[in-house]
Amino acid sequence: MGLLTFRDVAVEFSLEEWEHLEPAQKNLYQDVMLENYRNLVSLGLVVSKPDLITFLEQRKEPWNVKSEETVAIQPDVFSHYNKDLLTEHCTEASFQKVISRRHGSCDLENLHLRKRWKREECEGHNGCYDEKTFKYDQFDESSVESLFHQQILSSCAKSYNFDQYRKVFTHSSLLNQQEEIDIWGKHHIYDKTSVLFRQVSTLNSYRNVFIGEKNYHCNNSEKTLNQSSSPKNHQENYFLEKQYKCKEFEEVFLQSMHGQEKQEQSYKCNKCVEVCTQSLKHIQHQTIHIRENSYSYNKYDKDLSQSSNLRKQIIHNEEKPYKCEKCGDSLNHSLHLTQHQIIPTEEKPCKWKECGKVFNLNCSLYLTKQQQIDTGENLYKCKACSKSFTRSSNLIVHQRIHTGEKPYKCKECGKAFRCSSYLTKHKRIHTGEKPYKCKECGKAFNRSSCLTQHQTTHTGEKLYKCKVCSKSYARSSNLIMHQRVHTGEKPYKCKECGKVFSRSSCLTQHRKIHTGENLYKCKVCAKPFTCFSNLIVHERIHTGEKPYKCKECGKAFPYSSHLIRHHRIHTGEKPYKCKACSKSFSDSSGLTVHRRTHTGEKPYTCKECGKAFSYSSDVIQHRRIHTGQRPYKCEECGKAFNYRSYLTTHQRSHTGERPYKCEECGKAFNSRSYLTTHRRRHTGERPYKCDECGKAFSYRSYLTTHRRSHSGERPYKCEECGKAFNSRSYLIAHQRSHTREKL
């Protein structure tokens, strides 16, 4: 068996068959072809890139390859589409065209290698395939290398006479399509060992084993190698700890040239007794069974002899005929089954040295993809958001987020999706199918992700940890929502009123206020709620129920959130930090209110006078000025206040308590605000400045009174004579004049 070529793993479609494929199936075809090509590249089996791969990477139709003038020449990279174009009339012309393009006016007889080669015409060879013999006077391996790398001699069968051993090697590059002979045609024969080789580069490497030429050194295994292409292949095989040994000569080779023997793993064909030592050759072998039969496809009423057509039938019927014997999973493609079966259940033999990631699949393709992620090589990048992907198909699906395209539509409800897998999952809602079952409790789920999340309830594992507060979650979505508590992000905005929310579910519930849909009303006060749980919590206000109790101090709360905030008093935790000044708070509402000191936002407005406030509590207290309400009454003297803080400060006048002391002069005060304003006498600070005249004051009340001199406002009116004043102190002083008159 020869070296695996791109043609061996390529899938062919006729033009008629290609036109019947859906866009998703074409994308699948392109991904499979590109992935097969990358597999060959990772194993060092491809010399240069086929035309078909170039077109597929540019997301062009494969049939556009036929419109190109340039024809692929070398057989191991020969495009199976361009091959059809090489008829007897065009082969010689195409060959001459390639020669002239690369070497100017030089013809076949005047190549730059002619100093080392003698050209002898072989008699009896006519037609397109011009058989020529080259006698090698002085062997130079670099000449052979350049000869084949330039792809000059690929279209004609050649013979090479090696003077040192007087052995003749023949090479044929074109496949006789009518007779279906082997793609490689004639073999290279090395008489000294009677071993057949498929390509001259392999012959040269084998020759070097006997000659003893070893020019390339491997740093990993301290081995010396025979050819320039060997180090790459050797390092890959050394990395995977796989070597192939020739039993006849007991020489170790890094390419599978002769009898292959894989030490770690083998792949057995389900349809015959064939055992392959490489996954790619196992895939190649399976195509033999497909080509041996002809499948009848009733939908198009034609016989299909290619595996691609059989796959089309399977796609139409939604069949999954390939079943895994180990886990019972069914797949619609033999390739998928093969890849699925070679995944070990426990061991992870492949580890990428850059990031330390371990892979289940013992294949260099997965290491190549991880290398692309780490190094940024060969990634497909989105032009809209610069996000990168290792597969072009993933990029195409991602771009639908920006374009809004949703090509996959549900026939039951008409809902559309941008990805076929989303549609498959959605269909389970209608069918009730739940293929993912928990082994612990037997509960079934329609998505594998739901099963994975459910299994954490049994293990108690919480993989997702917050970097700010170290809180852990079983679901990544819960962590994302939690992180918005720290960042203050509220991405969900109501189009009706502009209110923002941190969760989409909260926005959905809020919208019901505007639509009036399914509102839950309190039987006591008729207050409506969009969520039933919110109604239950609200009813505790009327019942006085406080089910959440603090274990530290025994204090009870009607809401769990209040208990959580209360716990932070005991722990001293302040997880909410202001980015502007680094001040921390124990609850998110405190941070939200604090931010308004930086932004100057005042969202709460008094309906009576239009005055705006940063805090809702301030506007509530302010309204009491208009209503005259003073709900806070001193039990000692009966004096009432419209602020609770005023009552607290007043009560200290009865107790004599003065907890706030000035460090400069030792003077004590019964209010924190009094101490703050007192300190300005020592510092000379006057933070309150008039916008009209620029005059500054050390007290806010002084600035408020001063502004009334500009506006003419006099809110304090004497009930005796009707005289008005702009300051309360002026009114009090004026009222004393009336009391003196009475005395």
Swiss-Prot record:
Its predominant location is nucleus
Single Gene Ontology BP term? regulation of transcription by RNA polymerase II
Keyword vocabulary terms for this entry: DNA-binding, Isopeptide bond, Metal-binding, Nucleus, Repeat, Transcription, Transcription regulation, Ubl conjugation, Zinc, Zinc-finger
The zinc fingers classed as C2H2-type run over 267-289, 322-340, 380-402, 408-430, 436-458, 464-486, 492-514, 520-542, 548-570, 576-598, 604-626, 632-654, 660-682, 688-710, 716-738
Cell location: Nucleus
What name does the UniProt record give this protein?
Zinc finger protein 267
Q: Which CDD domains match?
A: KRAB_A-box
Cite the location of the cross-link Glycyl lysine isopeptide (Lys-Gly) (interchain with G-Cter in SUMO2) from the record. Answer: K66, K135
For this UniProt entry, the molecular function terms from Gene Ontology, in alphabetical order, are: DNA binding; zinc ion binding
Q: Where is the KRAB domain?
A: 4-75
What does the UniProt function comment say about this protein? May be involved in transcriptional regulation.
This protein's GO CC annotations: nucleus
Q: Is Manganese one of the keywords UniProt gives this record?
A: no
User: What family does the entry list?
Assistant: Belongs to the krueppel C2H2-type zinc-finger protein family.
